[in-house]
Amino acid sequence: VAVDTLGRDGGYLNNPLVRIALPEGLQQAAQLMRTLGQGARVDALETAMNRAAEQAVPQAKSLLVGAVKSMSVKDALQVLQGGETAATEFFRERTRTPMGEKFLPIVTAATQKVSLAQKYNAIAGQAQKLGLLGEQHASIERYVTERALDGVYTMIAEEEKKIRQDPIGTGSRILRSVFGALK
């Protein structure tokens, strides 16, 4: 459910829980650019970052299904008896690294297609000139990939909380979709 929600147009961009904003080091520069009438450039950059994440997310489904298929009885008991996000933590431990490896090339291709790296570097360059950003900022591709991964697990956690609060209503609908995907 989380993957389907995030993988559609606006899945990240229109969801305040997972929307990918500019890196913290660029927030001040973005605000200054908005003040100077350059808000459209900032918005275009943020939109492109979120679209790149939306394109990568469908790759998560096979990894999440694989994690469920490989779940041992011990794992299942730990998830059932664990806290409100025990399943999310199980998925994070089992899938974050391989998911990141699948996301990164897609994010990289998406950012190159829309010249995101150049847009980011233009804003980062202006921020650097103003002393608002150091040279050590991460690559935009890795930043977007990490935020995309965070978004997947945030949405899984939200679904898990709903299931634990209403296991009959919400849980049966989601379990049907999960086990339907296992076929």
Model-derived regions: residue spans:
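An amphipathic alpha-helical core segment
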Residues: 106-147
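A cross-kingdom marker for long, charged
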Residues: 148-183
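Pore-lining and gate-forming transmembrane alpha-helices of multi-pass membrane transport proteins
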Residues: 93, 97, 134, 138-142, ...
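Extracytoplasmic
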Residues: 13-17, 44, 74, 147-150, ...
